[in-house]
Amino acid sequence: PYRWYLKYIKKFHGKDMFFSSYGTFMHKLIELYHKGEKTPRQLVDMYLQDFKTEVVGRAPNRKVFSSYFTGGLQYLKTLQPFPYDVVGVEKKVDFVVNGIPFVGYIDFLGRKDDDLYVVDNKSRILKPRSSRAKPTKADEELDAYLRQLYIYSAAVEEEYGKTPKSLCFN
């Protein structure tokens, strides 16, 4: 998405806002889990202790704040390992597509039975496609997330010589 482009390609780091700092905080916690450094219980404790200092900016309203806070807490309480061996967590990839340089961070790259899997952690629930003739904002957002996964698959193919078997959201 555009925010990813600004952050990783243009190296623009604007003022942290609620949604971006929430996503950054959740990714940091999930990374600790997949690297084997923290248990879900430890992550819950960190979440409760650090939420106020890590998640800056204001949510649009109390309902949104409550939804994100409780959703993140529930997510961390129910974390399960992926059915893949770990190849990389927050794996940095530098690559070129059609002459355009990209830098990205694959949330989780796994291997099972010699196949590769790219997993993109989402710290909130994604809405399914609407099937409307004219795409909704949620449809366009989902398309942007999917494009990011396909771009990452190009980086994986460049480095490992094979395309991932699956591109997944978690």
Where are these regions (language model features)?
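A non-catalytic, helix-rich entry segment at domain boundaries
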Residues: 25-92, 96
